[in-house]
Structure formats: C-alpha cells, structure tokens
Amino acid sequence: TSPYFVPDHGVQDALTLAALRGVDVRVLIPERPDHLLVFLSAFAFLPEMIRNGVKIYRYQPGFLHQKVLLVDDHTSMVGTVNLDNRSFRLNFEVTAYIPDKIFAAAVFDMLEKDFANSRQVSQRELAERPLWRKLLSRATYLLSPVQ
C-alpha cells in the first residue's frame, strides 16, 4: 500500500515483470487523495500496469496513509517510504524489513481487511475516462520528478 503511488520506471518495471511471471502483485491506493497532483499522476501509467497483470485497488473508506509491503508469507516491510520520487530521492525515510512469518501473517490479515474494503480498478474504467482527465494525468505525470 502507498498513499502516493508514482514509482519511477525501475519500480514500475519490477512490479510489472513480477506480475508477468505470475506473482500476485496488488497495489492499494486511496480512493480520495490529499495531494491531487500526485494522485492524478498515477493514472498516467496505471493502464499499462493493469494490462500487464498488476492489480490496482482503491481503498473505499477514503484516504489510506499506510506504507506496507508483503512478500510471500514470510517477509514484510513497514515504514514511511511512499512509492514516489520524493521518497526515493528527496525525503529522509525509514522502513523496517521484517523477515518473520508470524508478523507477515498479521500483515496479511490486515491487508485482506483493507482489500475487502477496496475495489479493483479495471482497464475499462481507465479507458472510459474523459479525454481531459487522461491528458491531465499525463501532464501531472511530467511533474512527478518534483512532486
């Protein structure tokens, strides 16, 4: 999960390649943003990621600020890092790497509840957005290195 999901090309490629290998890659983003430009930027590259098998969900209760990563059934990461350029290159962030099956099970349970309160974004939904929204997403994505 990441409240600000505008990863650089390396992270986009890693997520996409994992999905193409058959890994269940799910990304949870908020339904409602607190930073509109960052939120709109994500929609510039989501169609390609979804087309390649990455599952994108929007958390329906609203804004979700957690930053959590679960790998298989044994490794979790919890911290302050968003999947965006500011976190990768500018902000001072910290994330705990926790190689523990019991903790991973607790994270899994938490995420399952979050996904139960979310809806999956479809390729069709993104394709049917008005042209002005598509153009706005692309324009804001150009600003992503400085957002």
Residue ranges and their predicted role:
Residues Y4-Q147:
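PLD/PLD-like phosphodiesterase catalytic module centered on the HKD motif
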